[in-house]
Each structure stands twice: as C-alpha cells, then as structure tokens.
Amino acid sequence: PNPLVPGAFITCTATYVVTQADINAGSVTNIATATAKHGNDTVTSNQDTVTVPAVQLPGLTLDKTTTTANYDSVGDTISYSYKVTNSGNVPLTPPYAVSDNKTTVICPQTPNPLVPGAFITCTATYTVTQADLNAGSVVNIATASAKYGNDTVTSNQDTVTVPALQGPALTLDKDTSTPDYDAVGDTIQYTYKVTNSGNISLQPPYAVTDNKIGAPNTVVCQQLPSPLLPGQFFTCTATYTVTQADINAGSVVNVAQATAMNGANPVTSNTDTVTVPAVQLPGLSLDKTTTTGNYDQVGDTISYSYKVTNSGNVPLTPPYAVSDNKTTVNCPQTPNPLNPGQFIT
C-alpha cells in the first residue's frame, strides 16, 4: 500500500542459489536491511540475519576392476585398478588410500582437495601362488579412504574374483630293467614314475594299476608325498613272474595307468606300455635205444626205441618224425603241441 501506515507491513521475497563454497562453509548466513521514505528522508530498518545450515555429506565410492581374465601358473600377475570417487557433497583431502587384503595399492595424492564428483585411480599387482591355483580363484576385498577435516571417510567394500584355469594332470612313465626272458619263473622288474604334470596339487589315494600285476604280486609305491605338488613325482615298483604262455607268446606286453585325486574328482594318467621280448629257444633231443643185445642169423630183428624230447622252451607241433638210415620209424602224432619237457616214443 502507499502510504504504508503505522502497523502495516509488506512482504518481500528472494531466492539464492547455493554454491559449492556454501556447502563447504557449512551454512549460508545473510544480512538484510529495509528502507522506505518519509518525505525526503530515507528511513532505514534494523539489520536482520538468517543462517541456513548445510547438510554436509562426505562420501567416497570405490570401483575396483581388473584386466586379468584368469591365471594358470605360479608367478602369473593380476593387475588391479581402483577408481576412487568423491561421491559426497564436500571436498576431501589426502591421504588417499586403498586397503586390499591381497596386495599393496599405490594411490596418487593429487588433486588436493578432491572435489565432489572428482576421482583418482590407484593401481596394484598381485603375484599368483600355488595356493591360489589350488583354491581355484583369487578373491580380494578393497576399501578406499580419504580425510574430511579430522575425520576419515571410508568407501564401500568392493570385491573382484579372478578365476584360475586349473589343469589337473598326471603322467606315468613305466620302464623295466629286464631286457628279455627265456624260462618259466624268470622275473621282470618294472618301475613306475608318477609325476604331477598339472598346475594344481593332487591328493591321495594314489594308485598304479597294471594289467599284468595281480595278487599275490602288487605295485608297491614308496615315500608318497601328500599333497603331490606340481612337478613332484613318486616311484613305484613291481615284479612279474614269467609263465609258459609268456614264452609261447614271444613277449610280455603290459599296460599301466596311475590315478590320484583332485578333491573328490579322480585324475587319471596316460597309459604306458612296456614290451619285454622272450628269447624263444626251440629244441629237440633224441635218445635212441635198443633191447636187442645181438643177432646171429639172417632174419633176426633188432628193435629200436626213440625217445624224442622237447628240450627247448617253446611248444612244438606235428608232424613228428625220426629219420633212420636203416629203417622206417613210426612216431605218434600226439600230444599236440609237444610242450617243453614232454616227449614221445
């Protein structure tokens, strides 16, 4: 109204746009004075002050990533990147740090301050151990921190998992120190070298099976490590006793395979075959006798007996024959075959 009579009032309005400095300051305080005219004179009011407090929300966000897709060997490195962002509404100051349960993280200490929305990038590397391969993955947890005044501001936890490429493997190398055999009862000595050729540790039970070694003979393994680390090996031995069938066959061929465990899963080796040749010695001995002491006239008969013995180490087969420069010899054609030590008359 005009004039503004005593006791009357008017209401004025204004808006103010908050700045980052206002948030940093913690409040907006402003002072106002009103004026009007009385004739030619200016009438000035008292000063009035209003303070509006800021809601200061210091905040820090961590985003952890890796460029390493997986790992498969001891000594492999995993590279990590940590993006640390001021997600609050007030500046933060150093020291900037990232705590990681697997590695030491390097963070830049600039800019100072770290204003809202700004970020820094920290880095770290981790070297893979055998335990990491055995575990199947590297899982690590990180947290970032910065300062707001005297207070420490802590970020969220962020976890990154990098999987292992586990390659359980077992290699069997079978050998013998026996070059050959030629008699029933000969023994063939075998050795079995079982190596963990994979990249993770293996556990018992360990076993070597051989198609020629059975009760009462067994494959005997000594000094078994537990676990069997990659590159480690153990040695087993076995003895095989030659049979007539082995001599007849011309060789002993046997196939072996090793097994171990990866947790609840069996790990099977290659099959390895060793062939030991027989020294086959076919032989025949003739023992010729007569029951006729002498003769004294034409027409007397002389009786001969021919003992034909298989004196070798392999069976012989018909036709059986004896050649005699004086007579024709009749030989039975059984048994067939004529085994070592057997004879016909």
Named regions from a protein language model:
Residues P1-T345:
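Exported/extracytosolic protein signature
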